[in-house]
Amino acid sequence: MPCNCFKSNVHVQEYKDLLVFGYASTIFPNDYQSEHIAEERHTVPCLGDPENRVDRYDCRLLLPSIDVAIKRNGSPSEQCPTEAMEEDMCEEERYLDMYKDIQREQEKEEEEKRRNDQRNAIGFDYGTGKVKARESDSEDEPFEPPEGIKFPVGLELPSNMKLHHIIEKTASFIVANGTQMEIVIKAKQRNNAEQFGFLEFDHRLNPFYKYLQKLIREKKYIPDLNKRPKKLTKTSRASTSKPAISSSLAAIAAAHGSDSEDSDSDYELHPSLLSGGAKRPVTPEKPGAIGPRKKPVEPEKPPDFTLKPVGDISQRNDVYAALFKNLAHVTRQAAGVEEVKMNVEEAKKEKENDHLDDPEYREWYENFYGRPCPWIGPRPMIPATPDLEPILNSYAEHVAQRGLEAEASLAAREDLQLHFMEPKSPYYSYYHHKVRMHQWRMYQPIEQNLSPLVLNSPAPPSAVSSPGPSSLMSLNLSTPEPPLNRRQRRRLLDSSRLDESITEPGVIDPITMLQIPKSVSTPANLDILKTPISFSLRNDEPRDESSFRFDPDLDETAGPSDTTANFSDISGLFPPPTPPVIPPSTQMQVDRKEKARIFMEKLLQEKKAKKLQEEEERSKLEEETRKKAEKISESLSERKNTGRSDRREEAPKGARSLDEIINNRINSLLSESGFEPVEEMKRTDEDRERKRHRKRSRSRRRSRSCSPRDRSREHKKSRKSGRHHRSRSRSSSRDRHRRNRSRSRDRRR
């Protein structure tokens, strides 16, 4: 009974937070629906078979025929090796996470075991193997000097190899990075004096450290930092305990294909459950098999055996060492000559291999620059960066339209910094490619409109040497080129203004467009051009607005019209091509930019004019004030010189008269406002003090001459007179205040 109570309490505690609630519902039979289902009126015939009726949502209704569902192929299908391999790969990918999780858990268990049983772990042994004695650790190994180095007598050496490795590594680091790093290491390792105490000057190993540092700096000793001290690792322990494994365990491991020979875990999974445990047999693949193929197994290369000398022969003092030292200089000279020859040959090969052999490029270079090409072809093309691409494209188009002189004028301007026009630039070949591309686009419509006579005649050199679509469409030109910013457009306009003298705008000569070679230009070969050529100049015709306007500052209405030529009488020559046309939107943008520039210049000029006007006004005011000051100073100096004596006499009177006028004016204002003048009050106070002083002096004189009774009488009289005087002064001040108040009231009214 108590057990049941305990169990019930436990269940109550488990489901204490669980809450179940619901609502009451009324269930009633649906006679119509039940009758409908009982009579199977909700079913439909399956694929036209009235006897076989199914629900209208049955999936068998989707089949074209019922025979497809009934028909079954009893014969097993042949298994293809590629399909089997695909299935194995799918299975491996399907359960890859499970295998990885198992491996992760196994690694965690091994780490926990290693931590808990690190000191007490003893490998299992059947007693058949030989137990080797444990090797001494490298930390306790005594110091052994490196091969080929003799330390001076009296130099104190480190006690073990561990300390020697620390000193060696520190010395090589200081030699490589400078002596300042020694201060940094000393500051960081100030608490580790046991290992880095040799950095102190008074330490016993500091001379050894300095001597080792000197050897490394002079390259007499090169330490092998990759060489690690010998430590007793798990692999070495496992190798020592390999003979202790019995033959039965080796047979079991070989049968199951286990790869872990030195595993100490007793709780491993069966090898068949591991991902890499079971090795599949290697089956030869068929040559016509379709599907994934296995990676071919590469044969292992045998290790390279290199024989190293036991010691440095140059450090010996015998006969062979002397012979070696004498022959070392000769061998070094021969090796140096061979290295120089090899370097020269490699440089020549690199220069030859750097440029690609392209005869079309050489022909175009010779026709464009007028000199033979110094290379066999262009360098490998490196596309420009996104920020350089629009600038390079715009200048390449400008050079393609204007020619070599435009390129020379642009390259001479250092403010533009057009480094891609230099042959040393990595984008030089890409720049030439863009120039050829724009030339080909320019001459393509001309070639399409040529007459048969002109097509039979030799073509212009630029058209012949211009690249065709086969050689120029290697790059993706479908993407639109980004527009130029304000600074780039301004630079392009400035460069076009500088080059206006090169080609006159609006004048097109068909003979120069054809560029007849010298062999054709002789009089004997010019039978085609015997017919007369008539030219007509039209000055009254309006200028064609669709043509490209090179200078936006020119007025469209002013100036004579362009020179035109009538080629109606020429037989065999095509009409002159139209000038390059730019869209109206671009022309409007250029006009707006020019108007904005003119407007900004006007604003700047107005500001400058205002500043100049303000400066002039300031200078005028300064001049006037300076002149007034000079006049005043002159008048004062004259007065001082002429009437210095008269001024001394009249100055106090004039000053007194001015002071009296000012004081009277102030007193009148104060009296009008209802206040007593300050000066009058001061004067009355002074007068009173004087009177009192006089009375006291008189009373003293009398007291000296009179008796004590007379003195008392005089004292009483003076008291009475003082009281009377005070009462009179009070009454007079009251009357004065009343008068002032009445005056102020009258003024307000």
From Swiss-Prot:
Residues 690-704, 714-749 have a biased composition (Basic residues). Residues 8-124 are annotated as: Dry CEEERYL. Pfam families: DRY_EERY (PF09750), Surp (PF01805). SURP motif repeats lie at residues 166-209, 391-431. It comes from Caenorhabditis elegans. Residues 560-569 have a biased composition (Polar residues). This is Protein SWAP. Keywords: mRNA processing, mRNA splicing, Repeat, RNA-binding, Transcription, Transcription regulation.
